[in-house]
Amino acid sequence: MANNDQKRDEGYIEKLVQVNRVAKTVKGGRIFTFTALTVVGDGKGRVGFGRGKSREVPAAIQKAMEAARRNMIQVDLKGTTLQYATKAAHGASKVYMQPASEGTGIIAGGAMRAVLEVAGVQNVLAKCYGSTNPVNVVYATFKGLKAMQSPESIAAKRGKSVEEIF
């Protein structure tokens, strides 16, 4: 597979996850359009995904990249891994992600790997169950990452210290 990640001048890492051709049948024949799914991140915990549609592939990718930049979230990482094991689902896709020790690398497949790479996660064990549709896997991965909170943020919300929580 080609290396689909690029670094832009803003410091974002961009990855193309999927390009899909869709055909609409009309009286005169078929009209082909393309949809692109991309993920964008800064490698330090900020990550976003976007979808773009157009009659040409480059235009669809460009629209998806712009949508991904507008749709960015901040993920609370614990160094180069996740805070704790988490599960999430979207549609028939279910994902499970758990932190891993230093040197493990990203053990994840397909669309989930792209999201974790651009987010800056370097050590993680992840598995996708059910449907492996890239769109649903990306949505589910984002749900899991978005729901994850650091002990510091939980302590701040409760008005306690981190030691009091544990």
Swiss-Prot record:
One of its GO terms (molecular function) is structural constituent of ribosome. The keyword Ribonucleoprotein applies. GO terms for biological process: translation. It holds the Pfam family Ribosomal_S5_C. The keyword ATP-binding does not apply. It comes from the Bacteria. PROSITE patterns: RIBOSOMAL_S5, S5_DSRBD. Keywords: Ribonucleoprotein, Ribosomal protein, RNA-binding, rRNA-binding. GO terms for cellular component: small ribosomal subunit. Residues 12-75 form the S5 DRBM domain. Belongs to the universal ribosomal protein uS5 family. Part of the 30S ribosomal subunit. Contacts proteins S4 and S8. With S4 and S12 plays an important role in translational accuracy. Located at the back of the 30S subunit body where it stabilizes the conformation of the head with respect to the body. The N-terminal domain interacts with the head of the 30S subunit; the C-terminal domain interacts with the body and contacts protein S4. The interaction surface between S4 and S5 is involved in control of translational fidelity. This is Small ribosomal subunit protein uS5.
